[in-house]
Amino acid sequence: MEYYAQYLRGLREDHDLTQKDIARVLGTSQTMYARYERGANELPIRHLITLCQYYKVSADTVLGLDRKR
């Protein structure tokens, strides 16, 4: 599983949100968002940007790039 998939699930759960809530923010279905969280589908850049703005975190954090420094 991709790091970002685990991180996104953790963010969502920390904010007491459902997959359906976040799917609405992204303009996608709950089923598709669940696939992003499982790592079954790659997260499109446009969704990454939207989620970073929504949660107020950097893309480096979501992608785990700041852990490798």
Label each residue range with its predicted role.
Residues R46-T61:
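DNA major-groove recognition helix of helix-turn-helix/homeodomain DNA-binding modules
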Residues A40-T50, R69:
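Short, basic-rich loop-to-helix N-cap that marks the start of a DNA-contacting helix
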Residues L8, I22-A23, Y33-Y36, V62:
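Conserved hydrophobic/aromatic packing and binding residues within compact polymer-binding modules
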Residues D14, Q53, L63-R69:
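Short, charged recognition helix plus adjacent turn
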Residues E13, G27, R38-A40, R67:
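Residue-level detection of the helix-turn-helix DNA-binding "recognition helix"
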Residues Q6-V25, T50:
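Short basic helix-loop element that most often maps to the first helix and adjoining turn
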